[in-house]
Amino acid sequence: MIPFGYWFTFANTHEIASMKPGDGVDGRAGRIPVGDHFKALARNKYWWLTLGLNFALWTYNGMAAYIAKYVLGNSNLIAVIGLATVIPMVIGLPFAGPLVARFGKRNASMAGLVLVAVGSLLVFVDPSNLWVFFVSIIVRMVGIIPMNAALNAMSGDVVEYGEWRSGVRSDGIVFSSSSFSMKVAMGVSSAAIAWILGASGYDGSLAVRSAATVSAMVNTFVWVPVAMVVVMAALLFFYDLDKRVDRVGGELAARRV
């Protein structure tokens, strides 16, 4: 039903844009074919970068629940883990806007990624220590706040840059493709957990997990986020649109007069 719901929403959603004669592709007014949108976006490197950032951001792993049950020995902690994940985000997001405005989307996100890496590696201090585990989660979530806050704004900048560069404004496709990459990443993450646990010899029917399985859980919890931090940092290195946003916005405004 969920895939059908997404398709129904997509099929019955129509974007309405005010256009003047001469707007569109090569001066053609009216509706722009979907193919022209994708052709324009394919040449927009910032679109590809934000897709990669969305994918990497959401390739987090759900290994925390396994660690709570099999490493910390308390499956009742799963609900508390959820709170430790959500509360920092709720508290921190209102502060992310001024931070991003002050230092820029890329720089604020880069700084946050350092915290994500530190928070992940913190688990190695003592993987079986409850407080170390929760501090790790909280530090990671605080670190990811700037990126979470910046990505939607980055997508908006990608739309503006695309219109400035090619004359094609693709709001709907840019934002929906970001959402799609997020969902694909979450699916890949879930599948990866199953593959890793299977390779480590995980057996849900056993009361005690093997040392190899426990090690796989801990290492996945730590190294998958660290690897994604490296990927996101590399993508952000090439994301220099922050420096061009004002110029792009100004020229677009002049064209629309």
Model-derived segments and their meaning:
Residues 86-94, 187:
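Residue-level signature of mid-helix packing/kink "hotspots" within the transmembrane helices
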Residues 91-105:
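Helix-to-loop junctions at the C-terminal end of transmembrane segments
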Residues 124-137, 147:
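Helix-loop junctions at membrane interfaces in 12-TM secondary transporters
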